[in-house]
């Protein structure tokens, strides 16, 4: 039986060309039953993800695959995620923070979270939704609205919607994984001075 996947790509009217080409390859491969849902101009991020959650539950697909519009997963990325047969799994998506690239896959440490640098398939506490596959059982167990911004007590900062969703999923007993061999392109603007400083520090 073909895997059935509801692909959700929230966007602001643009997706990467590389992502469009990968979607075309998946659609024409005949390997999957796919639906692509691309809600535009819904902000903030947690609202867009909750819309995707709601629309997914109206359909009969087994999996929801979130892809960020500025990401470029490899063509074999979907097969890799499916092959793990776990409830929540994503690839490695890097972001730039404090002058260094870090994976958006984290483990809890004390009262906060720290990036986790793993190998192969490893369990984490939080993973970005930039390229993440979620089984229907998770999305049926969690109410629509489970993606939410979590404010810090003093209101000066907060946790993004992925943190809150992952916390709620773990509270329901679901495990979260990152495939550290699945590298996903992520287009980000950054200050090249920071790159230069990082190279000097590392050299």
Where are these regions (language model features)?
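Conserved catalytic core of nucleotide-sugar-dependent glycosyltransferases
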Residues: 53, 74-151
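N-proximal low-complexity "stem/linker" segments adjacent to membrane-targeting elements
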Residues: 1-43, 47
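Glycine-rich phosphate-binding loop at the start of an alpha helix
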Residues: 46, 50, 75, 163
